[in-house]
Amino acid sequence: MAISLITGPANAGKAELVLDAVRSYAAREHDPLLIVPRQADVEHYLRELAGESVTMGVRVERFAGLISEIVLRAGVGEAVLGGLARERLLASLAERELAAAAGPGFIRALSELLGELRTRRVSPARLIGALDAWLAADGPGASRAELGRLFMRYEAELKRLGRCDDEQRAMRALDALRERPALWGGAPVLFYGFDDLARLQLDAIETLGRVVDAPVTVSLAYEADRSAFAGRAATFQKLAPLAGEHRRLRPRAEHYAPQARTALSHLERSLFEPGAARVGCGSAVRLLEGGGERAELELVAREIASLLAQGMAAEDIAVLVRPAGTAIELLEEVFAEAAIPFTLQRRRPFADAAIGRALTGLLRCVAAPSGETAGELGDLLAWLRAPGLLEVPALADSLELRARRAGASDADRARPLWEERHWRLETIDHLREAQQRGPAALLDRASRELYWLFCAPRRRAAELLAPDELDEAGALAAGRRALAQLAELARLAPELAPATAWELAGVLAGIELFR
């Protein structure tokens, strides 16, 4: 067996062993793949390897990149239904099978459930049988038997559309490698940084290492009999029998700075352990307490400013916040006022980007086939205020002032006020004409409008994007990707695609950007 398992606590040297293996494979021109959980990890390890001139032949990917490589080498050519199109299909099926409109959260959870059923190789018939048995044993309140029917309808719809989903394609590719192991070619694969491993990831590890016999290295932060690692015990128990080699690393305190070593090493060794002793922490662990959220953030900002003044690099400082409960806008305001350089990794809606806000506003200004427009004054202004759209941005401010004085709170009444003094807003008419021609035409026009909005402030300038413009580029990429998926859906199943500009605006508003 070609699977090498490396386990140990945090900071025990697992990364060092994995990267040494990457360097060794690269030196022998074996073209290794290093698989890490996040895009930030991809960029970090690419920089580290590039600094050592070890990037030739080395690929650093997220797990999705590994699956794409497996699909390519296995020769699985089925087209995949995009994530947004899949959600539209599931929403339609849920409405029919469950007799209720399902919200975005439910649809995402349903998509994840069906994906896990795929990776566990549970067919619709098997699910229906299990749910029926549950229903017979425990009564109507115990089982959601309609989920089995929904899964079966989903499978039938994919066949009708001539598409598969991501999990289905991945499982077919892994099955192809099991049948013909030589398709992989023997490239080494190394996993590092995963807190835990999902079923599909374990399946890929077993297929590559045990069936294909490719060199596979898996690093897992784990120690037996430690409370902090109890949640990973099941994953370890699945990996251990597959491993031909298992290296257990001992804890190492030298990773920590000398002045913090005693406290932080003790914290790592004692975390969640009952009856752990207390040690003096010195200045390694400090509590900052403010009279309110802003005061607390100001204390954090002052602490960071002190560290920067002492010569610490900004990229070596991390600030962790609660996913819910911390006002991100307040954090940005406080750090900006303190001149703290920072980047914020968070999910945000498509409309947070200037071009996303402008496009959704523009779409809401388009009259429905009935002739009614639900767009508000703010939607029209969001479009007109897109960077570069107006050579004189103050014209939008003037329109807002006149509209509010006239009581024109919707786009229908505000538009004539604009056109009394300025040019006709024909873009709205072009979108309405596209809407009348059908979903495909509407989506094509919306995609072009999004691109023009991105280009508006950059016309006649062959310039590189500044760092603060990368968010807009990300919004452009995400928006065009979503519109392309919807355009494909409009070609395959027009009844599932957004039929009106207003509906399309709602779909785009649900897109999340990550930075």
Predicted features and spans:
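Accessory N-terminal region flanking or inserted into the helicase ATPase core
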Residues: 2-5, 94-193, 200, 204, ...
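Short, polar/flexible loop-turn hinges at active-site or ligand-entry regions and domain interfaces
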Residues: 28-30, 52-56, 73-82, 95-104, ...
